[in-house]
C-alpha cells in the first residue's frame, strides 16, 4: 500500500501521525511511505530521519494526497484539504463529525473510506 503522511495544518496541531520508527515498520512490511516535507519537524523528527528508514519526502500536501492510497493524519482534514481526498483513498484520523456538518458532508461527497476514532 502507498501510505501518505501530510503535515498537519490545523491551528495549534504540532504532532505528526507517523514516527520514523512507524515508517520503518511499514517499509519493512513492503509498503511505500511518503512524508510531506517537514511533517515531523514540530514533533522532533527531521526529513532525514524518515529517509534513513526508507520513507520518501514529497514537497507539498497536494503531492502526498495525489499519490497515497491511504492518508494517515492526527486531526481531521480542514476545508482546504476536502478536495484533495479521493474516492479511492482510505483516510485514517480522528474525525469529529458530530460538531462539523461541513466536514461530514465533504467526506461523504469524497466517496473515500474513512477509518476513525472519536
Where are these regions (language model features)?
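An N-terminal-biased, well-structured beta-alpha scaffold segment characteristic
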Residues: 2-112
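Conserved small/polar residues in nucleotide/adenosyl-binding loops
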Residues: 116-118
